[in-house]
Amino acid sequence: MRPAHVFATIALALLPACSGVRAQDAKPGFRVPDDVAFRTADIMSEGTRMAAEIFAPKAPKSEKLPTIVMSHGWGGTAALLRPDGIAFARAGYLVVTFDYRGWGRSDSRLIPAGKAPEKKDGKLIAEVKEVREVVDPIDQTTDILNAIHWVVGEKLCDPERIGLWGSSYSGGHVVYVAARDPRVKAFVSQVGAMDSRWSIANPQMRAYTFGQATARAHGSLEYPKPGGKFGSLT
């Protein structure tokens, strides 16, 4: 039998985030201190563009810097991590923050709206639906891995000193990724979400979770729409 926390992952995979959390997103205009270098970048994750922000000291003390990949928590965006990115850059780190696919300024994940048309030369034109503001732990840990793939190609990155930082829901993600990627030498899990058995490990919730999965597999249940209430699966 699978551990109870596996069922928590299944259930949480398709939950939309609370709109109240999204409202806390930082405004686009913010001031970067004179001693910090800042730029934006695009990171590709499974073919989808993720919006990233890069922080580094303007006068680095070495050619290669210890690097921190930071990931936001449930319903957040990378903009919320700007104060931390600035603080770490001032301490001598190269910092990468990013919006998960379908969040913030990142592009949406796309799924076909119906059956795919015939291909021509390996290409097709199809109607698609965007998937946004859906908390999917499998996709999000993949996004963190792709952020690591990206940053090792940065000139300032020391590939032997890469660390992860995650808060809340992503605090659990960084533990998962660090256990599977030998390039990660350290991680910080701030109030990390590690175990949801208290909310899911009962027969009623398991039945509900698997019922949702069956309906989705049959195509009778769509992904939640953006802006739904916390915990809603409709």
Task: Give the predicted meaning of each segment.
Residues 1-5:
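Positively charged n-region of N-terminal signal peptides that target proteins for export
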Residues 7-17:
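Bacterial N-terminal signal peptides
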Residues 21-23:
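Boundary at the C-terminal end of the N-terminal hydrophobic targeting segment
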Residues 25-63:
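N-terminal cap/lid segment of alpha/beta-hydrolase-fold proteins
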Residues 49, 65-66, 91-93, 159-160, ...:
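Loop/turn elements at helix/coil->beta-strand transitions in domains of secreted/extracellular proteins
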Residues 61-65, 70-107, 196-197:
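Short substrate-entry loop that stabilizes the transition state in hydrolases
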Residues 80, 116-155:
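Alpha/beta-hydrolase active-site loop
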Residues 139-228:
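Primarily recognizes the serine-hydrolase "nucleophile elbow" in alpha/beta-hydrolase
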